[in-house]
Amino acid sequence: METIAIHRHARSSAQKVRLVADLIRGKKVSQALETLTYTNKKAAGLVKKVLESAIANAEHNDGADIDDLKVAKIFVDEGPSMKRIMPRAKGRADRILKRTSHITVVVSDR
């Protein structure tokens, strides 16, 4: 049984979150949580919350055994970007893109 959890509009760029997502793809959830706990990146905290949510969904909604679960799929898509302005010299301005991402974690007992 596959169970999904999604975090939309996470305030980190998809490029940065994908570095962390690649670390846990295909691992058992216990090993993935341990990896994320000791990964020194902001994105690790974001991915860990989504993984914990997927585990809770599997346990509560599907009655799955946590020990059998593994990370079947994890992918990160780009979300909308917030446009901000950075004042520059001589009255000019640059546009700053505050990027967001959508993190999707699928856990499965197979």
Curated annotation (Swiss-Prot):
Q: Which Gene3D superfamilies match?
A: Ribosomal protein L22/L17
Whether Ribosomal protein counts among this entry's keywords is yes
Which one GO biological process term can you cite for this protein? translation
Q: Which InterPro entries match?
A: Ribosomal_uL22, Ribosomal_uL22_bac/chlpt-type, Ribosomal_uL22_bac/org-type, Ribosomal_uL22_CS, Ribosomal_uL22_sf
- Please give an example of a GO cellular component term from this record: cytosolic large ribosomal subunit
Q: Which residues cross the membrane?
A: none
Q: Which domain of life is it from?
A: Bacteria
An example of a GO molecular function for this protein is: structural constituent of ribosome
Which UniProt key words apply to this protein? Answer: Ribonucleoprotein, Ribosomal protein, RNA-binding, rRNA-binding
Q: What does this protein do?
A: This protein binds specifically to 23S rRNA; its binding is stimulated by other ribosomal proteins, e.g. L4, L17, and L20. It is important during the early stages of 50S assembly. It makes multiple contacts with different domains of the 23S rRNA in the assembled 50S subunit and ribosome. The globular domain of the protein is located near the polypeptide exit tunnel on the outside of the subunit, while an extended beta-hairpin is found that lines the wall of the exit tunnel in the center of the 70S ribosome.
What do we know about how this protein assembles, alone or with others? Part of the 50S ribosomal subunit.
Family under the similarity heading: Belongs to the universal ribosomal protein uL22 family.
Q: What is this protein called?
A: Large ribosomal subunit protein uL22
Q: Which organism is it from?
A: Proteus mirabilis (strain HI4320)
Q: Tell me what gene encodes this.
A: rplV
